[in-house]
Amino acid sequence: MDSIKKKMMAMKLEKENALEKAINLENQLKEKAKDFEKKEEEMNDWLSKVKNIQTEVDTVQESLQEAISKLEETEKRATNAEAEVAAMTRRIRLLEEDFEQSSGRLTETSTKLDDASKAAEESERNRKTLETRSISDDERMAQLEEQVKEAKYIAEDAERKYDEAARRLAVTEVDLERAESRLETSESKIVELEEELRIVGNNMKSLEVSEQESLQREESYEETIRDLTERLKTAEQRAAEAERQVSKLQNEVDRLEDELLSEKERYRAISGELDTTFAELTSF
């Protein structure tokens, strides 16, 4: 009877120990489950950070590409403006040459007109002189008449030359007015081009500053990309480490669950054995 009681006490103690161990294992399992959830949350946080870093890298690269495109477009516009300025400069030079030629023709026409006027005045003076003289000699008269005819011819020729010179002068004046109008237009265009050139110069300076700033931003972007890439690698390493920790915790949880199941089986076996022992005692 004492041996049965001792056995019962031992079994009861073993049952209590098994129950306590099962409770401890269950508590450990809960702690491991909490650690598992915590590690899983950390892993999710790191994955979210990795995605954010990747998004930030993509945004920086897009901004860098956009800045490069704007710089290329600005350089293209500056090149077109310089070509237009060069074309207008050539046109102005041609207009100046045309104006110089027109001025030369006008000077030549004025000289010829002066010569014709002097010849006409000289003929008129000769004619008046001949008219005031009283010459009875027929030969002298004939000579004078011939001189008068010649003078008239010279006067008529001078008048024709004068008319022709006047006509050419009028045409030249019209050409000169047109040339002056074109010159004024050219001067106005030159002013506009100088203003555009000044603006282009300012824009070029701004572009140089923008290019320097773009280079600085590009260097900053490259440094940021390197930093983000390094952070991404670190985050990936930590995420991989977190996954390994989670896997390790999962294995530990599986082991504890197996131990808990084993202890529960052992507890049921001890309980069955106690029930059998109590039944035997009751039968006595």
Swiss-Prot record:
Q: Which organism is it from?
A: Echinococcus multilocularis
Q: What family is it from?
A: Belongs to the tropomyosin family.
Coiled-coil ranges (or none) = 1-284
Q: According to its record, what is known about the domains?
A: The molecule is in a coiled coil structure that is formed by 2 polypeptide chains. The sequence exhibits a prominent seven-residues periodicity.
Protein name as annotated = Tropomyosin
Tell me the keywords, alphabetical order: Coiled coil, Repeat
Q: Name one Pfam family in it.
A: Tropomyosin
Chain's role: Tropomyosin, in association with the troponin complex, plays a central role in the calcium dependent regulation of muscle contraction.
Q: Where is the composition biased (Polar residues)?
A: 101-110
